[in-house]
Amino acid sequence: MVRLTLDLIARNSNLKPRKEETISQCLKKITHINFSDKNIDAIEDLSLCKNLSVLYLYDNCISQITNLNYATNLTHLYLQNNCISCIENLRSLKKLEKLYLGGNYIAVIEGLEGLGELRELHVENQRLPLGEKLLFDPRTLHSLAKSLCILNISNNNIDDITDLELLENLNQLIAVDNQLLHVKDLEFLLNKLMKLWKIDLNGNPVCLKPKYRDRLILVSKSLEFLDGKEIKNIERQFLMNWKASKDAKKISKKRSSKNEDASNSLISNFKTMHHIVPVYYPQVGKPKLAFFSEIQRYPVNANASPESS
């Protein structure tokens, strides 16, 4: 295995010191270091590289993030496909904008408090034990709420992403090949993420639910791409018109049901208050039987008696 040292950087960076310039002075000027796929398993003290802004260390054997406290100007850090199990020792990287940690052994997204400039976080394809899923530390989510714009959490056995509602400036979410199941949970999240214009959920069970795409388009006005497919204005307008028509029918049916209930109630009350009784009265020919309510048994004329007709 190989350790990343200043000497290794000096020997492999094609440094060309000017006259009377030392190697140390050259190292201070370095802004980019690329040691990807070099069997590196540890990072030594690189404090001389104070102007380092981009560090490529992907496809190595690094198990622990160390000795980066000096890199206060670092904006891009590539550590994907290593052996890292814990996100740590990054809080001094105040200017960090992009962090790539995919393909490691990370079980909890944590330790990112204080990284107020972090805009992209890539933690896809973690090599987790069977049955485990990637989790989010609420403290880290709160810390990234204002800054994070792009998040990749694909293939991590995740079954719930409602906690991501805190990421109010998130505009791209890639969460393919997880275990998301409920459309209602996604509707809740999209209602919160008002700036989200791209979401990819391919490979989740929820994608097979009836009206899955229609429901997500209807709930989010900002969404432009869903599962890699553009949402055209004509598609959204059609769904909005369909929903408006459906809602109008529901309201009409509800009103009709209320009117019917009121009518039935009135009839029932009338029958209860005024009992129907039979009345016999003499008539030429065969006697007839008439039915009147109690309030109809007597004529309006007070001078007439019931037997006078």
Swiss-Prot record:
Molecular-function annotations in GO: actin binding; dynein complex binding; tubulin binding
Domain of life, per lineage: Eukaryota
GO cellular component: centrosome; cytoplasm; manchette; microtubule cytoskeleton; microtubule organizing center
Gene3D superfamilies the record matches: Ribonuclease Inhibitor (3.80.10.10)
The UniProt record lists the keyword Metal-binding: no
InterPro entries: Leu-rich_rpt, Leu-rich_rpt_4, LRR_dom_sf, SDS22/Internalin_LRR
Main localization, broad class: cytoplasm
UniProt repeat feature LRR, residue ranges: 29-50, 51-72, 73-94, 95-116, 117-138, 147-168, 169-190
Coiled coil segments of this chain: none
Domain spans labelled LRRCT: 204-242
Record's subcellular location: Cytoplasm, Cytoskeleton; Cytoplasm, Cytoskeleton, Microtubule organizing center, Centrosome
PROSITE patterns linked: LRR
Record has Oxidoreductase as a keyword: no
UniProt modification remark: Phosphorylated; in the testis.
Sorted UniProt keywords: Cytoplasm, Cytoskeleton, Leucine-rich repeat, Repeat
Cystine bridges: none
Subunit structure: Interacts with PPP1CC isoform gamma-2; the interaction is direct. Interacts with actin, dynein, KIF5B, KIFC1 and tubulin. Associates with microtubules.
Function: Regulates phosphatase activity of protein phosphatase 1 (PP1) complexes in the testis.
Name the UniProt record assigns to this protein: Protein phosphatase 1 regulatory subunit 42
Originating gene: PPP1R42
